[in-house]
Structure formats: C-alpha cells, structure tokens
Amino acid sequence: MKKLFLPLLAAVLAVSACGILSSETREERVVREAKEAQMVRQGLETGNFTIDIDRMYPLRGSSKMVSNYSIKVKDGVLISHLPFIGQAWRVPYGGGHALTFDAPIVNYTVTQPRTDGYEIRIYVKTDEDEHLYRLTVFDNGRASLDVQSQNRERISYTGEMDFYSKEEK
C-alpha cells in the first residue's frame, strides 16, 4: 500500500501544480482578448492577413482535418491554397487548379454584424472560375470560410487567423 501511495501522491501534486502555475488571472485574460481583437480588426481593415485552415467541410461526406493550407490577403491579392473535394461541372482537362491560385481581388467588403466578429466578402476571378469567399472572423481569431464557385460545389473551412506570421510584419 505504501508503494502505491507515494507515486500516487506525487502525481496528484504534479498535476495540481501545473494547473496552478499555468492559470492566468481574469485581468490577464481580458488584456489578451482585447489585444487579439485589436489585431484582428487591424488585419481586416488594412486588408493584410492570413487564415490558417485546420478543417474542411465538403458539401457531401464528412469533415476532414487538414494542415498546411491557408488563404492570404495581401496588397489587393488573394493567395488561396485550399484543398477541394466535391463535384465540378466545367473544369480544364486534368482538373485544373481548383482553389489554389493567386488572383487580384475584384471586390472586398468588411462588415461587423456581430459585436464579437466580422464578415468579409472577397470576390475574385481566375482564368478557370469565379469565386466568392465569405469569411467570418471572430475577435479571438477563429475563422469560418465558405467558398462558392460558379463551376464547383460549395465548400466550407474553419481555421484561425495567424497573428504572428513573419511575412506580414
């Protein structure tokens, strides 16, 4: 019994110590959230930001976790590097580039219909298709993206705004 008690006591103390050391105060959390909200607002107003995608939701089938995909808005250009799963109607032979392209933004609008987030509509034309990117970004940096194309099925993504990208600084 003594052999079991000491390791168990050490484990309980270690877990409780980690919880105490890592918790932030209410004031620290409020300051962090305000800083994140200000960084989101600044990125959207200047039109220079990156959204790292972590999950995709095809119109048919189940959602899939993804990594190393993103969209980036910089200097009036949308740099889209997104996976696509779904039906396509008119595409070049071989499938084309789908949602992987760099294209000038035709229309960019930002609205704030909610107190904790923004809606961004980005319209682009590529040589293959026309795309409407509807992006909802919350004050904490989480984002939801819905892509509608003329020649492909609608697809949705979720991700997070990259505040600390070295390329944006």
Residue ranges: model-predicted function:
Residues 1-18:
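Sec-dependent bacterial lipoprotein signal peptides
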Residues 16-34:
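Bacterial Sec signal peptide processing site at the extreme N-terminus
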Residues 41, 68-70, 134:
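Short, surface-exposed charged micro-motifs
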Residues 41-56:
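A short, Trp-centered hydrophobic/proline-enriched beta-strand micro-motif
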Residues 48, 77-79, 142:
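Structural motif
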Residues 53-66:
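N-terminal post-signal-peptidase region of extra-cytosolic proteins
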Residues 67-114:
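Mid-length scaffold segments of soluble, non-membrane domains
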Residues 106-169:
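Helix-rich interaction surfaces within compact, conserved domain-sized segments
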